[in-house]
């Protein structure tokens, strides 16, 4: 605060705001029944103060008190951030930190500041059930269906990546596992994941205005939504694309008039025109090893930028142990890449920061 660095719950947090305003904020939120109003200039300063704190630190601040958790989740805070130009884009990732083959999914956010470690998102009991489907819409991340306690589930949870709050939607009509989910015109379309007994069981749609699920009949839905379940096809943003036989993983991103994905065939970042079926390798990324286990590609804050995630296994000998003792740790890496056209049929990528200095190294887990 004011150029100083303070430690909170073991984490060092550097705040850009004046220490007096933060202390006043702490005093205000100490009253559990206290509410803040925009018409009080002093309390406007409090909102202004909190809005200048990076969202990356919200999980730590939420531990201060219930009052702080309420403030961080409030729409007034987001409105203030937008008004003063302190909006941020964060990457969210779910990692299975399994040990001894025990399923252990955890959500994390990654700070836009280079070389920052992942910060854990508040734990939720059903934050990523096995075989559930995840889809994002704006700042909301939807977790649909999956197995809960070994049984297929009707549940749908929503994680607000801005406030770090979880909420639950009304249950689906039927339990679904590994369903296809797409959001079109703010409605959630869910298809498959259930062996239908009749035509009404094929899919359903959630209307946020009425907060109800309705059957999705093939005769009442447009062809774009139906094509979600066509083998070898892909639907993003209400449009359908084909993979044209290229073996891809499940990660694609639409970038302006381009479609980018991670190819298991070439072990590279590949691209294609939206109106074409030919996949090409993005050039200029020779620093990326073809032996890397790429896991995800996603949009990185707008423009022609993508973020690529991958993991690697490192074997090492702990200090003080015998030479025969070895451990294996998983490293999760992330790089931000900007792409640009150079000539006809060529797309070049470059790292938005130094390959050596700004790659993000995160030590997550040790496997014995």
From Swiss-Prot:
SMART domains: Kelch. Gene3D superfamilies: Kelch-type beta propeller. Pfam families: F-box, Kelch_FKB95. Keywords: Kelch repeat, Repeat. This is Putative F-box/kelch-repeat protein At5g02995. It comes from the Eukaryota. Signal peptide: none annotated. Residues 35-84 form the F-box domain. It comes from Arabidopsis thaliana. Kelch repeats lie at residues 140-186, 187-233.
């Amino acid at each position: 605060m004011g150029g100083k660095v303070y430690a909170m719950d073991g984490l060092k947090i550097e705040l850009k705001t004046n220490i007096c305003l933060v202390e006043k904020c702490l005093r205000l939120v100490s009253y559990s029944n206290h509410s803040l109003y925009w018409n009080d200039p002093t309390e406007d300063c409090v909102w202004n103060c909190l809005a200048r704190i990076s969202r990356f630190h919200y999980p730590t601040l939420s531990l201060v008190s219930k009052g702080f958790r309420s403030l961080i989740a409030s729409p007034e805070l987001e409105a203030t951030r937008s008004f003063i130009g302190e909006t941020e884009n964060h990457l969210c990732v779910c990692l299975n930190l399994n040990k001894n083959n025990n399923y252990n999914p955890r959500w994390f956010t990654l700070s836009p500041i280079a070389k920052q470690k992942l910060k854990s998102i508040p734990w939720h009991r059903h934050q990523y059930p096995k075989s559930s489907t995840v889809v994002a819409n704006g700042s909301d991340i939807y977790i649909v269906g999956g197995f809960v306690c070994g049984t297929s589930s009707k549940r749908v949870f929503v994680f607000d990546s801005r406030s770090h709050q979880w909420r639950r939607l009304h249950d689906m009509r039927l339990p679904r596992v590994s369903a296809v989910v797409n959001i079109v015109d703010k409605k959630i379309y869910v298809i498959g994941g259930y062996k239908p007994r009749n035509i009404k069981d094929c899919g359903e749609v959630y209307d946020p205005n009425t907060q109800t699920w309705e059957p999705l009949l093939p005769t009442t839905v447009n062809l774009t939504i139906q094509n979600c379940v066509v083998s070898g096809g892909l639907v993003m943003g209400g449009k359908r694309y084909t993979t044209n036989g290229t073996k891809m993983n499940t990660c694609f991103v639409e970038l302006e008039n381009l479609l980018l994905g991670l190819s298991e065939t070439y072990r590279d970042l590949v691209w294609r025109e939206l109106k074409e079926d030919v996949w090409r390798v993005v050039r200029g990324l020779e620093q990326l090893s073809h032996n890397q286990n790429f896991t995800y590609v996603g949009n990185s804050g707008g423009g022609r930028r993508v973020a690529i995630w991958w993991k690697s296994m490192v074997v090492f000998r702990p200090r003080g142990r015998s030479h025969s003792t070895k451990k294996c740790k998983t490293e999760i890496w992330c790089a931000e890449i900007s792409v640009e056209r150079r000539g006809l049929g060529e797309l070049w990528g470059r790292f938005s920061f130094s390959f050596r200095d700004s790659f993000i190294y995160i030590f997550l887990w040790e496997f014995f």
